[in-house]
């Protein structure tokens, strides 16, 4: 799990509860037990591709089941997926966000892994209301991301083939 995420959650007063991992993703029985037992669960946090520290990738079947559990227990999913562009072998597994029918999945990706580690810039896909709240929170905390790196990233995406760069 990304330590930056855990520190952010703790700073905001969250009580983080771990769920054991299996080679194909979260232990779904343990996840459902936690969803049933815990009060006021706000979201499921999951790194679906090359989970840290195990390196496991959540299977598509388990992604569907995680989404179904989130619907059943009416919780959001934070899919932290900074590595999904970096698969060089094996079968591509679409992000959990691709299953999202009701604005329940917040997808976070990273440009640091695919453009330059020093850039430390990411992107998000979520429902409009959540993106607007996130933007307001970001502006209140540090005004904005480095404009120069935003412009460099935008220009790169406009001019070059990202898939060829990663391959």
Protein language model regions, located:
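Conserved core segment of the aminotransferase class I/II
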Residues: 101-167
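Active-site phosphate-binding strand-loop segment of PLP-dependent enzymes
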Residues: 24-87
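Helix C-cap/helix->beta junction micro-motif
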Residues: 12, 72-73, 103
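Short beta-strand->loop structural element characteristic of the AMP-binding/adenylate-forming
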Residues: 13-23
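Substrate-binding/gating loop at the entrance of the active-site cleft, primarily
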Residues: 1-14
């Amino acid at each position: 799990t990304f330590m930056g995420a855990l520190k952010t959650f703790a700073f905001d007063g969250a009580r983080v509860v771990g769920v054991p991992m299996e080679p194909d993703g979260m232990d779904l029985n343990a996840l459902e037990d936690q969803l049933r037992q815990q009060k006021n669960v706000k979201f499921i946090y999951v790194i679906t591709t090359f989970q840290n520290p195990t390196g496991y990738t959540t299977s598509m079947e388990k992604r569907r089941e995680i989404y179904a559990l989130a619907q059943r227990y009416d919780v959001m999913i934070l899919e932290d997926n900074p590595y999904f562009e970096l698969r060089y072998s094996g079968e591509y597994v679409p992000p959990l966000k691709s299953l999202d029918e009701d604005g329940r999945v917040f997808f976070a990706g990273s440009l640091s892994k695919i453009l330059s580690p020093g850039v430390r810039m990411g992107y998000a896909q979520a429902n409009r209301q959540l993106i607007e709240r996130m933007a307001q929170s970001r502006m209140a905390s540090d005004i904005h991301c480095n404009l120069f790196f935003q412009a460099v990233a935008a220009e790169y995406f406009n001019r070059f083939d990202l898939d060829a760069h990663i391959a």
